C-alpha cells in the first residue's frame, strides 16, 4: 500500500500513529523486507516513522535491524518509560535493561534514530528507581545524535477507571485530580517530588524535551 500510494501521489514519507509496528515480528519482517527491496532500486526511496516495542537482540535480530534501516525507518518512538526494570515490570512492559541496551545499540549501529517516551513519577518509583533513569540517560549519551527526542511530559496523571486506579484502589488516593494522587505504599512521592524529578530528568538527559 505504501509503495502504491508513493508512486501514485509522489508521497515518500509515512507515519504510523495508531499501533506498534513490530507487535508481530513475522508481519514486521515481511514489511521491512518488502520496503528494503523496493528502496534498493527506487529513484525516490520511501521513509517512515512510528511506534515500536523495545526488543532485545534475540527477538529483534541484527538482520531485522539491517532491514529496518534499509526500509527507510527513522525516528522510531518507544515507550521506554523508566530506566528501572522494577518500575517497568510493574507496568508489565516485559523488557529488561539488557534488552534496552541491545535495542539502543542496534539502532545506533544501523543509523536509526529513536524517541524515548518516558513516565516520571510512577506510583512505585523510589529514589533508587529514579536514579536508575538518570543513569540510563548518562549511559546513552555515548550514542551521539541517536535519541532525537525524550518526551517527559509533566508527571504521571492517574484517571479514575483506568487499570492503574482500579487495581490499586485501596492504596491509591486520587484526591479529586489526576495529578494530585498519593500512593500509600510510597508516601514520599508527592506531587511536588514528582515535578522535581521531572525537572531533574529534563536537565540530565541533555536532549530536546516535551
Language-model-detected regions and their locations in the chain:
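C-terminal accessory regions of radical SAM enzymes
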Residues: 128-210
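Short, solvent-exposed turn/loop segments enriched in Gly/Ser/Thr/Pro and often Arg
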Residues: 17-23, 53, 120-124, 151-164
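Active-site glycine- and acidic-residue-rich loops that bind
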Residues: 56-59, 124-133
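Conserved SAM/AdoMet-binding glycine-rich loop
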Residues: 1-115, 120
